[in-house]
């Protein structure tokens, strides 16, 4: 099976891209520019990146970086162009190379390229007769167009691990999503969930794609929608079976029926995951996002365990929150991020880090980052570190002291257990639930109340007027190797 993941080759070598599949990278056009310079190009076919790696008069050893190693992120006049204005070539020189493109979120290579200099051309591509050509006039060069000369940048193996990667190079970009599409079909790396979420947080929403996902100015948009607006008034007191359910069929993940104080979740939102395409262990994830505004909304910018090695309940296998900000104005100046290893406080939030903002965090876009290392975590926002978690001798003892029964499972792993396995990325939006908001004045439900969800719904006249800018907007997601 083709694994739909992205392996970018920014200043690296040896990081293996994905092969197989029907798409063929077009042949690269190489040109020796008179009196000096090299130009390499391919026609644009909807790519999001073009990379060129080559060596002069020396064969490539597999997927090494080469003397030339350059990623191009923008096409010009219908072509993706690599330019080295300082390359001094002569007739008979031979360039060995490979190219790499990203198309629809997938990476493709053209391997074993060879090209020999048989002629020189002007900047406009016309052939130059070097025996009669006048001294050239150097064109004006913008700083953006300048390219460094050949450099050797060998691959140093990273501690980062990724699905379908035999080798990951230090500092390499191993996943990238810019949300430049216009529909979910354009997101090859993501799968949308369609299900009723349950334990351990029991939020008051269901996940679907019906009206809850969109795209705006290059950003993914996840918005809350009233369930009754999709179905009919009173559906929350009825029964709802989800078509195309991605949860476990025949369970409460796919079917809900109102009974007593329990109702069908009154709000629909969305959640997207890379579970089927990309997961990694150790690295740095950057998410540029604008948080939602509105009472009792919770953004989900998370890393979730791929295999639940240490258990699949009560966060026994861990959850890493890259960032979250509660949507209520009274809470929105405080940013949180970090690990969760239990469903209940005090240990649930004990290791979370926070940062007080001068203004509400949901006023604008920010870059939220989590650095995941073999011995701890760091939380950052806009490049500034606001929290560190040192694993020390492991999390078992502190969890045991806080009566976390599943902590003994972590003794099977390393000091980072349960965060020593692969995790995948999730982006979504949650509503209320029983753990993220403490009971108190102004909160229309009690977390342990038997009628919590219906009390939340019956008080919609209090919270719904605050839902003006409720969308979670994500500009990009990037994962870098250590």
UniProtKB/Swiss-Prot annotation:
Protein's UniProt keywords contain Signal: yes
Stated induction or repression of this protein's expression: By bacterial and yeast infection.
Highest taxon of the lineage: Eukaryota
Gene3D superfamilies: 2.60.120.200, Beta-1,3-glucan-recognition protein, N-terminal domain (2.60.40.2140)
Region: Disordered, residue numbers: 127-153
Domain GH16: start-end pairs: 128-482
MF terms (GO), sorted A to Z: carbohydrate binding; hydrolase activity, hydrolyzing O-glycosyl compounds; pattern recognition receptor activity
InterPro entries recorded: BGBP_N, BGBP_N_sf, ConA-like_dom_sf, GH16, GH16_GRP_C, Glycosyl_Hydrlase_16
Signal peptide: 1-18
PANTHER family: GLYCOSYL HYDROLASE-RELATED, GRAM-NEGATIVE BACTERIA-BINDING PROTEIN 1-RELATED
GO CC list: extracellular region
Subunit structure, interactors included: Monomer.
Keyword tags: Glycoprotein, Immunity, Innate immunity, Secreted, Signal
Assigned protein family: Belongs to the insect beta-1,3-glucan binding protein family.
Tissues expressing the protein: Cuticle and fat body.
Subcellular location: Secreted
Function comment: Involved in the recognition of invading microorganisms. Binds specifically to beta-1,3-glucan and lipoteichoic acid and causes aggregation of invading microorganisms. Binding to beta-1,3-glucan activates the phenoloxidase cascade.
Protein name (database record): Beta-1,3-glucan-binding protein 2
């Amino acid at each position: 099976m083709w694994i739909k993941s992205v392996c970018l080759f920014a200043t690296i070598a040896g990081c293996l891209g994905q092969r197989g599949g029907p798409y063929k990278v077009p042949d690269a056009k190489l040109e020796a520019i008179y009196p000096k310079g090299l130009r390499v190009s391919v026609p644009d076919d909807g790519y999001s990146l073009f990379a060129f790696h080559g060596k002069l008069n020396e064969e490539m050893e597999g997927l090494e970086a080469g003397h030339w190693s350059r990623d191009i992120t923008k096409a010009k006049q219908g072509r993706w162009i690599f330019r080295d204005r300082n390359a001094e070539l002569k007739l008979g020189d031979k360039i060995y190379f490979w190219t790499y493109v990203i198309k629809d979120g997938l990476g493709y290579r053209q391997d074993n390229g060879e090209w020999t200099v048989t002629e020189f051309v002007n900047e406009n591509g016309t052939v130059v007769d070097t025996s009669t050509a006048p001294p050239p006039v150097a064109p004006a060069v913008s700083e953006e167009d300048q390219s460094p000369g050949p450099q050797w940048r060998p691959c140093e193996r990273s501690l980062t691990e990724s699905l379908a990667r035999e080798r990951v190079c230090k500092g390499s970009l191993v996943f990238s999503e810019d949300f430049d599409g216009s529909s979910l079909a354009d997101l090859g790396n993501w799968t949308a969930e369609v299900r009723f979420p349950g334990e351990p947080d029991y939020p008051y929403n269901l996940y679907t794609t019906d009206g809850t996902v969109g795209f705006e100015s290059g950003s993914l948009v996840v918005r809350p929608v009233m369930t009754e607006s999709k179905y009919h008034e009173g559906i929350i007191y009825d029964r709802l079976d989800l078509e195309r359910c991605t949860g476990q069929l025949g369970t409460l993940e796919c079917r809900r029926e109102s009974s007593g104080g329990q109702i069908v979740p009154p709000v629909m939102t969305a959640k997207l995951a890379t579970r089927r395409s990309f997961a990694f262990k150790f690295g740095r994830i950057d998410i540029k996002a604008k948080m939602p505004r509105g009472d009792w909304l919770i953004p989900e910018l998370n890393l979730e365990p791929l295999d639940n090695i240490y258990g699949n309940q009560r966060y026994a296998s861990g959850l890493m929150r890259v960032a979250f900000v509660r949507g209520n104005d009274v809470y929105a100046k405080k940013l949180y991020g970090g690990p969760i290893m239990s469903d209940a406080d005090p240990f649930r939030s004990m290791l979370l880090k926070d940062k007080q903002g001068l203004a509400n965090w949901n006023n604008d876009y920010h870059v939220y980052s989590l650095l995941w290392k073999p011995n701890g975590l760091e939380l950052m926002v806009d490049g500034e570190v606001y929290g560190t978690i040192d694993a020390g001798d492991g999390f078992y003892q502190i969890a045991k002291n806080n009566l976390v029964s599943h902590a003994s499972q972590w003794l099977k792993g390393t000091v980072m257990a349960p965060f020593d396995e692969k995790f995948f990325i999730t982006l979504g939006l949650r509503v209320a639930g029983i753990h993220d908001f403490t009971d108190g004045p102004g909160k229309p439900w009690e977390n342990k109340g038997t009628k919590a969800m219906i009390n939340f719904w019956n008080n919609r006249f209090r919270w719904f007027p605050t839902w003006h800018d409720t969308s979670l907007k994500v500009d990009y997601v990037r994962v870098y190797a250590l």
